[in-house]
Amino acid sequence: MNVMDSFSLKGKVALVTGASYGIGFAIACALSDAGATIVFNDIKQELVDKGLAAYAERGITAHGYVCDVTDEAAVNAMVAAIEKEVGVIDILVNNAGIIKRIPMCDMTAEQFRQVIDVDLNAPFIVSKAVIPSMISKGHGKIINICSMMSELGRETVSAYAAAKGGLKMLTKNIASEYGGYNIQCNGIGPGYIATPQTAPLREVQPDGSRHPFDQFILAKTPANRWGVPEDLGAPAVFLASDASNFVNGHILYVDGGILAYIGKQP
């Protein structure tokens, strides 16, 4: 077999959560380019409609569902509907996520729980819903969208870092528990990616200068740029395809080298 054939996703059904725009949308487009049928969800109908229109502009016929991925009953109903209307899910990308940039001592317990619920509990809930059919089918791929904050800490993101660190370990445990069923569970850890979530960190200042955080990230990233959502597409195709059949429980950091870099000597 030609090695490139192992990257084909023809005949596969891929569910990407929270994929109306941003990183999830870019990953779903890449999976479609490799041949997969795309299913996505979002929390509001208007977001699903915008997503469907965006996919259509790319020439992709996607299937969109309204679902709150923190609601186990709603997730189970969505997965059952997908299996009936589209097919058994071969590839799951747990992408849906939120971040609240609040100093820890200013954050309420409820705000902390909200982040944990979306960024950690939801991947558990959705994975739990799709794994039984993957076992029955004899294969499956789960990709959890982790973060550099799975490894690092910094001010104002305590809940996010706790959730993404937990997601890293959930990834390893799913791989350990279900690897014997030919299910591979890996993660992608994005660096700083130019998305609507990070737009406030890249705003040009009134004097025309870069935002201080923007300057900080460029100085800390050997690639000397922010990533773009499309940077995550090819890594996702690799982890979703037969090319990664002996890769399990790993986090692939797509961060421009920031985790490897201690910084310039003063």
Segments (PLM) and residue ranges:
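Active-site loop immediately N-terminal to the catalytic Tyr-X3-Lys motif
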Residues: I102-C105, L152-S158, G180-Y181, N224, ...
